[in-house]
């Protein structure tokens, strides 16, 4: 099967924001080849919050890179019906010489927005993440949680289009809160849910934390150990601390890890 990944979003279905069919990703060749993903199928609906869980090395980050267009699948197809995906990583990766507002403006500038529009939209997004008063500050003047809020505002800015077209937005998040302390992480999870509900952005969120996945996801998807493929899905209730569901998913994750170790 040949690999296909469109340079510009292609209509898959009015009810599908992201569609992956039989996706395979192999690094290297011959005896040194490593298969990160194999036969992975996944759907994300417009405005849906999907959490990806799995053991280290199962291909979660690889999957995000493929959806973002940062890499190409070795086989299978990936179809998007969204604006260009925005990516948020564990590190905020803000430009240290730019203010918070200018960091948020950067993707808008690259997208062709005029100066006045950039400033207005950056101010609006900083207000959305509750940082309306820090636009003039540089990253070193902000706490870790505040820097991640700025990074979130910048990611949301990256989903905007200068032509004003109302394409569904897609946010790809690779363990964005993993480096934060427990209290700040809890606050950021709540803030992300608030922003998600107010914007209707589809989210594909990678995490190792089962509790985080259950709290955030409308759907929790478990990947097998490498090579990664979907082995189980659960429906979630965002904002709800469901101890029973957390225990069930944790037990299944342990089974996946144990079976891989035994093999």
Regions found by a protein language model. Name each.
Residues 10-20, 26-39:
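A short, flexible loop at the N-terminus of ABC-type nucleotide-binding domains that lies
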Residues 23, 109, 116-134, 194:
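Conserved ABC ATPase "signature" region
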Residues 51, 150-163:
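ABC ATPase nucleotide-binding domain "signature" region
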Residues 53-55:
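The feature captures the beta-strand-to-loop junction immediately N-terminal to the Walker
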Residues 68:
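Helix-to-loop junction immediately C-terminal to a conserved catalytic motif
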Residues 75-85, 121:
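Conserved ABC transporter NBD signature motif
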Residues 98-105:
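Short coil-to-helix segment of the ABC ATPase nucleotide-binding domain corresponding to the Q-loop/switch region
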Residues 138-142, 146-147:
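Conserved ABC ATPase signature
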């Amino acid at each position: 099967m040949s690999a296909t990944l469109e340079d510009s979003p292609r209509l898959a279905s009015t009810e599908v924001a992201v569609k992956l069919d039989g996706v395979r990703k192999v690094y290297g060749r011959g005896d040194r080849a490593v298969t990160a993903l194999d036969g992975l199928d996944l759907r994300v609906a417009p405005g849906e919050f999907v959490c990806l869980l799995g053991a280290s090395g199962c291909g979660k980050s690889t999957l995000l890179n493929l959806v973002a267009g940062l890499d190409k699948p070795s086989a299978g197809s990936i179809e998007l019906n969204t604006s260009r995906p925005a990516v948020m990583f564990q590190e905020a990766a803000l430009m240290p010489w730019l203010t918070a507002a200018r960091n948020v403006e950067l993707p808008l500038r690259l997208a062709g927005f005029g100066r006045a529009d950039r400033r207005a939209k950056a101010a609006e997004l900083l207000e959305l993440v509750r940082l309306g008063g820090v636009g003039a500050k540089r990253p070193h003047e902000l706490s870790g949680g505040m820097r991640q809020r700025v990074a979130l505002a910048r990611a949301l800015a990256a989903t905007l289009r200068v032509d004003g077209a109302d394409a569904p937005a897609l946010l790809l998040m690779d363990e964005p809160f993993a480096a934060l302390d427990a209290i700040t992480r809890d606050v950021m999870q709540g803030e992300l849910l608030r922003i998600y509900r107010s914007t209707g952005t589809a989210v594909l969120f990678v995490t190792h934390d089962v509790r985080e996945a259950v709290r955030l996801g409308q759907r929790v998807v478990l990947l097998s150990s490498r090579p990664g493929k979907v082995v189980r899905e659960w429906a979630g209730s965002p904002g709800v601390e469901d101890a029973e569901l957390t225990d069930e998913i944790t037990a299944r994750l342990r089974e996946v890890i144990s079976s891989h170790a035994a093999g």
